């Protein structure tokens, strides 16, 4: 029972870390990356679909993204989705493919992006703290119901705190790496 609570908590930490990595991948840096646009939602065939299901996305050079729709009739919808996103990119098309030049970031925009990164890291840390509280409450309930001993409760709390500390260090590292990537010219 103790291990069930700890394993469930550890699974939540992994999910939170992966969610942060996924979110930060979509934040623009000075370099072109398919991750910037692949999850943009495009109004297509009466529903919203991620761009990576509608087109082939490639990065032939460091400051250019090429989007080649499987159906050329989707070009206007894809351009609209890119323009409505907060990426600050201006698409151009030749009727078959969309070229997406990625201009260098201004110093001001870099600072805004760093703030976004820090804010997102903090949101995930709050989620981790809330989950830690819930896991410890679950352990206390097990102890109150006499399903685990007081010693097991303390061991479980220590293990949960160790996992939390390790996760927070990893989240800080992920955030610092993204900040460095954003600030690199």
From Swiss-Prot:
Keyword Protein biosynthesis in record: yes
One CC-aspect GO term: cytoplasm
UniProtKB keywords: Cytoplasm, Protein biosynthesis
Localisation per UniProt entry: Cytoplasm
Family label: Belongs to the RRF family.
InterPro entries with a match to the protein in the record: Ribosome_recyc_fac, Ribosome_recyc_fac_dom, RRF_sf
Protein's UniProt name: Ribosome-recycling factor
GO molecular function (one): ribosomal large subunit binding
Positions of disulphide bridges: none
Entry function: Responsible for the release of ribosomes from messenger RNA at the termination of protein biosynthesis. May increase the efficiency of translation by recycling ribosomes from one round of translation to another.
GO process annotations (BP): translational termination
Species, as recorded: Chloroflexus aggregans (strain MD-66 / DSM 9485)
């Amino acid at each position: 029972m103790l291990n069930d609570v700890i394993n469930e908590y550890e699974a939540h930490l992994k999910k939170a870390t992966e969610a942060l990595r996924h979110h930060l991948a979509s934040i623009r840096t000075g370099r072109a990356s398919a991750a910037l646009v692949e999850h943009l939602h495009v109004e297509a065939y009466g529903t919203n679909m991620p761009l990576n299901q509608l087109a082939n996305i490639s990065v032939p050079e460091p400051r250019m993204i090429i989007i080649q729709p499987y159906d050329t009739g989707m070009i206007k919808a894809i351009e609209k989705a890119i323009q409505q996103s907060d990426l600050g990119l201006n698409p151009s098309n030749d009727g078959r493919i969309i070229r997406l030049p990625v201009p260098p970031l201004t110093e001001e925009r870099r600072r805004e992006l760093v703030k976004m990164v820090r804010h997102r890291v903090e949101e995930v840390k709050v989620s981790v703290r809330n989950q830690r509280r819930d896991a410890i409450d679950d352990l206390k309930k097990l102890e109150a119901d006499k399903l685990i001993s007081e010693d097991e409760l303390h061991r479980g709390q220590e293990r949960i705190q160790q996992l939390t500390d390790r996760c927070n260090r990893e989240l800080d590292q992920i955030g610092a790496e993204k900040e460095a990537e954003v600030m690199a010219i």
